Each structure stands twice: as structure tokens, then as C-alpha cells.
Amino acid sequence: MSDYLDSDISPCSPYLIIDELKRGFERFKSGRTDHPHATAARVHQLIGGQHPQVALLACSDSRVPIEVIFDAGFGDLFVIRNAGNTNTFGSAGSIEYAVLDLKVPVLVVMSHQGCGAVK
């Protein structure tokens, strides 16, 4: 995953961040994932705090693992999950935390096909 999603640098253009999410998804679809930032060293690096570049509101469906489908690692994404990716009181608080405290420049609301929670 490119450095601009790294938690140790300052935010960059939201367009570049979205492009990196798209590239990660393409790697996942093609079966050529990098598994970035998925090491014990990365976990140790994040002890001092997190600075993700993206917050995602997504469904809690176990068939849609967000970090996996975007080929992201520890600290890259701030993921908020609930059934049907709905904006509940709890998810609103998490979004507020991501935007106001973590200063994420990109918020993605993501749904998926065949979601049983929104039938």
C-alpha cells in the first residue's frame, strides 16, 4: 500500500487516497495482494497512536472483510461496522471521532450486494 495511507505521515489529497483504495481493491480482485503493514513491527509502530487516512462505514457481514478487500494493513483504515452500514447513534459517534479527533480526510460509506440487513 502506498505511503500516503501510512499512519506516520500527514494527510494528502482525498483523490489520491481514493485512488489507493481502488488500487488495493484491484489487487484483491486479481489475487495479487501485498498484505501491507501486517507485521508485528507495524503493531509496535502504532503503540503511540493511530493516524488513518480513511474512515469507512461498512456492513458487519463477515463475508466482506474491509481491510482484506482493500489490501490494507494495521492502522491504514478506521473501520466502523454495523448491520446494514446504517448511521446509528454508535456509528455517528465513531464517525465524529474519526473526523474530529483522528482528522481523517476521507469518509467512505460502503454497502454490498445481497445485504440481509437491508432487505
Where are these regions (language model features)?
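N-terminal short beta-loop-beta anion/metal-coordinating cradle
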Residues: 35-75
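A short aromatic-anchored loop/beta-hairpin motif
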Residues: 2-44
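Short HxH-centered metal-ligating active-site micro-motif
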Residues: 14, 66-119
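Fold-independent oxyanion-binding glycine-rich loops
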Residues: 24-25, 59-61, 82-83, 112
